[in-house]
Amino acid sequence: EFDVTNLARKWYLGDNHGVQLSAPKSESSFSQLHSSETANQPYFVLEYASLAGLESYLTYDHQSAGLAGTGSVSLVNGNLIFAHADTAMNGNRLPVSITHYYNSCDSDKDEFGMGYGWRTSLHQTLHKVLYNGEVEFVYTDGDGTEHFFKKNEDDQKKYSDQSGLSLTLEVGDENITITDKGDNVMTFPLVSDTPTEDAPETAKVLIQKIQDAVG
């Protein structure tokens, strides 16, 4: 496997839009014939992560609309995320806020009966997907960003996120928890279904509870 993230970024502004694979040692001359009619055709697989929402490690062009909210356009894929703050309370221990989000990557979906592309920060979901023959979990946060979790080799009940946010997912007997690096815990119901080749995604379950590090 090769990480071509930086190379792919250069494709946007550069003239070269390809990948060259070369041996570490080369001879002065080399000749080899490959027939176009061979049964084993070469192929190149490019994997990319969903960049559908708002994340601190991505770059956006922000535009305020006053009390209506703020629009953010991703400089990576042109996706529009519009955030409208509904309410916010400091609280004695754990602050609470609710925000409406419109995500143009979800413009064809009305999952929560709020209009196409809309959700609130409380509509956080979890489901399973079948990817390269392995089952992974996908956590969708309040603005629509998808975070993928792969199973740990040393602990079959724990999964680590692939977005670099240091999130840990653990499958328990009664529920599933996601813990961040500050020891805040999100609790979800068990995802009982298993994805298959014919149905590679399971139904989504909604978050049940959020608990801070001190309980």
Sequence positions of predicted segments:
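Beta-turn initiation residues at beta-strand->coil junctions
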Residues: 141-142, 179-183, 190, 199, ...
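A short, surface-exposed interaction/processing loop segment used at functional sites
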Residues: 153-164, 209-212
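Secreted, disulfide-rich extracellular signaling modules
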Residues: 1-51
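Aromatic-rich beta-strand edge motifs centered on tyrosine
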Residues: 84, 98, 149-151, 169-171, ...
